[in-house]
Each structure stands twice: as structure tokens, then as C-alpha cells.
């Protein structure tokens, strides 16, 4: 339930809500108003150790529960998530700021991840080859790996945790979850519903906090694997530190997603696609379009329509249904984004839509409106860096080849999109672009949960991505059995 009282957030360890043993807390504001809605503990190492001990004890019995039974338990959780969709979306809008429309979409994508986890009996099946030699059979068996942990960001407080713990738990593991201290309330509700579904205590544990919790997870000898989603510098740190301590790590990192606009595109649908990708969720997502490489032949027409449509977007509190762009997560992030916009102007880019001057319209929240630059080049910080905001850079290119070359020069390689009506162009793009997830006339090429999610280059550190068969492989280990009987 959403209330107006200021909440003191707790940890959930071994099936109980408990106060952190530490004394340090951090205020959690509503990004649309700046008003404090909660205080979250910055838990110390001792809290992580208690959570790991609880998960370790629970693993002894949970790992032996038959796979179909684990799946049936998740069906109960799935039903509760579906029954509480509206409430979950409202919590996301309250603490994250994204519009209720965007939050509702996130809830649905999270539910789809749990749907994947319920299909684990199929996904965990091994392989067998009889008669590999005279009287000898060979087979591969999959087993859970133990206690695993997830470290998740603020921008998708429901979807990303649900990428992790349901699938890991369905595979027979137990879990320690550390969500962003910026969005702790949704995590609380996810855990409440999880135990309402009847799971044994200790199977899922929640430890709120900041970097001390992260370091404790990475260094704890009883945690076998760590899943992470966040910025590139932190992802690199998590990967290097976790692997140094002998852990399996998947670390999904930053992005600078490019869209190539060809002269043969459907102009109206392309403009709406770019707007949806660049400005929905206030641009705070790793699959947002932040650069458009538009071919010269259509550039002026495309930009004119894009600017006109962008100027129609309303900025404000995500609970108001007419608003398209909500607030950024914190005042500090807003100031960082304004710094990038100022940098683009100073570097000589042409500011076509200025999202800085909107305070008189939206009040005291952490708002930056949709912003568009033209005349951007690779020497500018606004092209190089992940801004994580509703800021779009336009680069004019002569043809598809130049657009692909531009895209591949980025240090990131998460997602990339082409807008075209040519199958040949789409094929050339698909075969030559360096990105983990590719879209053809799809504004956000984030795959459904039954496909793997991961980028390339500085967008991903690890081997196996989240979701799909990658996720099952990450959360299990194989045993190869060669046997004969006398």
C-alpha cells in the first residue's frame, strides 16, 4: 500500500523483516517533488553475512526440492504479481519518477521474466547420448550452484530484480538481493509477495544499502555467483573484484545506443520510434537511443518533424497521465545532465530543443526536458559518454556504411537500431553492426525474457547474459557423466 508517511526501510533476512545493525541511513525523495518518502539503511558487512548464512542454510533443503515443485511455487508468485500490477506500478512512479505508463510497462516485463522462470523444468534438462562406446553412455546433468547474489539499479526496480532471483531460485539456488538504495520500496514489496507465495524462509534475502553491501557480496566466500546491472565503471569493478574472489559474474554495463535512419524509412513511424526510445523513462535506461545517425538525403526532413513532435511532449509528475517525460532520479544527476548539455553547446553542437528551461512549468522536482542536438561529432562528450537522460544527439552521415562505422566507433555496444524498408539494408546492418541487441524498425530492441540480454565491448563484462538459456546456464553448473554397467 502507498501511504504518505515517511517509511523506514528494513532488511529481510531468513524470512523476517529486521532492522539493519548499522546506524547510517540515506533519505529517499520522490523525484517529482523532492519530498522525502523514506529512509533506507546503508547496511554494514554484518548484515550481508547474516543474509548469506540464511541463504546457505536454506540451500540445503531448497536445492533438493524437485524442479517441477519449484516451478509450481513460482506460479503462485506470478499470480500475486499479476494481481498487484497497479500497486507495483504506482510504487515505481513514486520512488523512480517514471510515468505511470512506463511503470506499468516495466511491471509487465518483470512478470514476463517470472513466466520464463516457471518454465525451468524445460530449460534445466540436460543432454544424453547413449552408446558413445560399446556399452557406455554419456550424459550432461545440470545442478544449482549454491548461494547467488544480485545487485540491481534504480532505473528498473522491478524488471531487473525479476530477471535475476526468480530464475536463480527456480534453478535451485538461494539468493541475496541488493537493490539500489535510491529505489528501496519496490524491492520490499517484491519480497513481501514472494513470501506470501509460500516460499521457505531464507530462500530470498534482501539487504538494503550502498557500496559496503556491494563489497561484502563480492568478497563473501559463500556466494558463488553475482549478477549486476549498472554503470560501466561499477560493472567493470564488480566483474574484476568478483572474479578475483572466485565468483561467476555477469555484469551488464553502460550504453550509447545508436539508431541509423535511412532515406527509405517510414518517416512518421521512425520519428515516433526515436522519441519513444530517447525520451520515455526520461532516457534513464540502458537501451535508450542517445544518438541518431541520419543519412543526409532525409536529414533535414527527419529533423524538422522530430523537433516539432518533441516540442509537444509534456514534462512533469509521472502520476499525471498527460506527461511523457518524468523527473530524473536525483538532483545530483540533474546537475550532471545539465553539465553535459552545456558541454554540447560549448563544443559547437546546435541545440534544437532545450530541456533546461522548464522549472517554471514543473516545479521543484528533478526535471530536464527532452533535449536534441544537431551537428554532433565524435570529438564531443555528448557523443562519447553515457548521459542517461532525455538528451539526443544527431549526427549526419552520407550513407549506411558511414552510419555503421560511426556506431561501431563507440566504446559501448549494447543496442543498435536501423529504420528502413529495405531488406538489403537491414541485412547489411545486422551483419556489420557491433551490438549485442539489434532492432530493425524496433525502437527499443530489448528482447523478450526467453532470449538472452547482453551487450558487447564496454556494455558487458562476462560470458553469459541474463534471461533465456544464458540465465539458466549462469545459475547452474554441469556434470558430465560417462557410465557403463557390468
UniProtKB/Swiss-Prot annotation:
EC main group: oxidoreductase
Residues at the active site: 286
Subunit-structure text: Homotetramer.
Reaction(s) catalysed (UniProt annotation): 3-oxopropanoate + NAD(+) + CoA + H2O = hydrogencarbonate + acetyl-CoA + NADH + H(+); 2-methyl-3-oxopropanoate + NAD(+) + CoA + H2O = propanoyl-CoA + hydrogencarbonate + NADH + H(+)
Gene that encodes the chain: iolA
Keyword annotations from UniProtKB, A to Z: NAD, Oxidoreductase
Top-level taxon of origin: Bacteria
UniProt keyword Disulfide bond present: no
Function in brief: Catalyzes the oxidation of malonate semialdehyde (MSA) and methylmalonate semialdehyde (MMSA) into acetyl-CoA and propanoyl-CoA, respectively. Is involved in a myo-inositol catabolic pathway. Bicarbonate, and not CO2, is the end-product of the enzymatic reaction.
Annotated binding of NAD(+), by residue: 154, 178, 181-182, 231, 386
Name listed for the protein in its UniProt record: Malonate-semialdehyde dehydrogenase
Record family assignment: Belongs to the aldehyde dehydrogenase family. IolA subfamily.
Pathway: Polyol metabolism; myo-inositol degradation into acetyl-CoA; acetyl-CoA from myo-inositol: step 7/7
EC number: 1.2.1.27
One Gene Ontology term from the biological process aspect of the record: inositol catabolic process
Taxonomic classification: Bacteria, Bacillati, Bacillota, Bacilli, Bacillales
Keyword Oxidoreductase assigned: yes
GO molecular-function terms, A-Z: malonate-semialdehyde dehydrogenase (acetylating) activity; methylmalonate-semialdehyde dehydrogenase (acylating, NAD) activity
Organism (species): Bacillus cereus (strain AH187)
HAMAP family, per the entry: IolA
